Design a protein with these regions (language model features):
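Substrate/ligand-engaging "lid" and interaction regions
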Residues: 1-191
Length: 191
């Protein structure tokens, strides 16, 4: 919905989702499709919104989380955690042509790109230690001219959704447009 200064409105449907793929090595069809996507030279960016905890590989005492320990032991073909799945896909990309890519954390935490990079490099190094990947792959992932980890800042300050716009959209035949009140008493809407 575009609100013009003269009070008129313009409506456009913006479709940003083309496909959904499970990032599970236990599902061969989805896993192979994910590999196909990651090995495509046209893929330029992968974004993440997995919360700061999604990048964590170790508990507070410095030991690996059990799923991370399993990922290190089992390697790229049986990756389960988010960072292991990402590194497994980067390994496929490396083998396919060492194509550049930007890995963009959109999580609202300080130095989000650095946190993502640290986790990716840690998993990469651990897999190198046990022989799943080679030094060339470590160099590929470490070179920020090829695999970039930019820092981002997310601004979620948005105006309260208009109930009138929701009604107008529903009158146009678009369903479920009413704003929702969250547990934190903020308002969100699908428009």
């Amino acid at each position: 919905v575009i609100l013009h200064g003269d009070g008129t409105r313009e409506y456009k449907v913006i479709g940003a989702l083309a496909e959904a793929v499970k990032a599970q090595s236990s599902d061969p069809a989805h896993w192979n499709r994910l590999k196909e996507i990651f090995t495509s030279k046209s893929l330029q960016m992968v974004s993440f919104t997995i919360t700061e905890k999604g990048y964590a590989l170790q508990k507070a005492d410095g030991t690996w989380f059990p799923f991370v320990e399993a990922d290190i032991k089992n390697g790229p073909d049986k990756a389960t955690g988010a960072m292991a799945v990402l590194v497994a896909m980067l390994y496929e990309r490396y083998k396919a042509g060492r194509y550049p890519i930007a890995l963009v954390s959109m999580d609202n935490c300080s130095q989000n790109g650095a946190k993502l990079r640290e986790s990716v490099l840690t998993m990469t190094e651990e897999w190198k230690k046990v022989g799943f990947v080679d030094e060339g792959f470590v160099n590929y992932v470490s070179d920020e001219k090829i695999v970039a980890f930019p820092w981002t800042m997310i601004d979620k300050i948005t105006p309260r959704p208009s109930e009138q716009i929701a009604a107008d959209l529903e009158n146009l035949g678009i369903e479920n447009m009413q704003p929702v009140i969250t547990s934190k008493k903020t308002y969100i809407a699908p428009f």
